Structure formats: C-alpha cells, structure tokens
C-alpha cells in the first residue's frame, strides 16, 4: 500500500498501533488536526471482538462517507462473498479523509485499486476545489 501511494506522489507515514478504539481515535484526531489530508487504516473492520476501527472513526464525529465502503463491498463481491461482512468505513474529519480498509493484504490491494480512481477527486472536494 505504501509503495502504491508513493507511486501516486503521496508522502507516506506508516505506523502500527495496538488494538483499541480509544488509542486509534486519539491518533487519528492528532494526525487529522496536524493537516494530514488522507489517512488509510488497515485492519479492525471485521466482526471479531477486537475489530473496532469503524467505532474509532465514528467517535471522531466527522461526516460519514458511506459510498466509499459501499463501493468496495459491491466491487469486492466479485473476488469473495466475504466482502459483505466488512465493516469498512470512511469519514471526513475537518479537511482529512479517513478510510478504514480490511486487514488482509489481498483485500487492502483490491480495495485500494477500487478507490484509486476517485480518491483524488474526493480530496479535491474536501479542499474546496471545483467539482470537475
């Protein structure tokens, strides 16, 4: 994921956080408040007891962007019926777009490929640029 983002010209910072919605919430808020425009989280979107990434995103109180997760689940069904179990989520918090992707490397790759064509436009809209 990092290499693919860098190939698109993004500055990438990668971190591994411990489980827990509160830790993730604080970290996401700090990054978004510092001016980061896009945060991609991987993992914690399943049905397991430690899967709390969507809850951390919702706790931010930003604007939900449900279409991104809906698109990924819909397109992901062509790869596996299990995509419908994903609790992927996306929110706009201030001027930052935060997307919670599944944790498996294959699902991350597939979902990033699905989102790549629309991410630049989404970020431009958040920045207040024209809706070209």
What is each of the regions a protein language model found here?
Residues 1-132:
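Non-catalytic beta/alpha edge segments that cap or flank active sites
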